[in-house]
Amino acid sequence: MQKHSNLENKILKLLNTEVMEERAKIPKKIMFELTNLCDLKCQFCSTHISKRKKGFMEFDFFKRVIDEAMNLGIEECALFTTGESFLHPEVMKFIDYSSQFDLYTYISTGGRCLSEELMDQILSSGLKSIKFSIDAGNEETYKIIKGCDVSLDNLHHTIKYLYKSRNEMKSDLNI
């Protein structure tokens, strides 16, 4: 264990306090719920039973919040909380806007809403990462967890297409 002098301890305490106070003032990540609609009924999620009014975030509100957050030094932008963001009819507008900044912009999806055309748009958008909610290792368990008639094989096909297209387009999207 390294010993510090009394003066060193005071300096370390002062530095740690100032650094922590400064970091605490400014959030580094912002998360958006683009919609609270979802095409699944996952066993672990309350979105499908929520009594909240269903709807979509307005782009002008999103733009205003992003602009203000950028002025505060935000570093990450998550385009999901509950709901399936790709059900929003203007999802690419949100992705394109947030991706134009020096932000690590990412999204999570169940994957059912992703057409090949939409995936190609995603690959050229500047989105940094897309995460897939898989939640099971076999078809039977997947259907139980997702709470509806879904296909794990279809999701695998979607992810494989995205990987193949990413390599062909030389995109830097993390999957």
Regions found by a protein language model. Name each.
Residues 2-129, 141-145, 149, 153, ...:
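Conserved alpha-helical substructure of the radical SAM core
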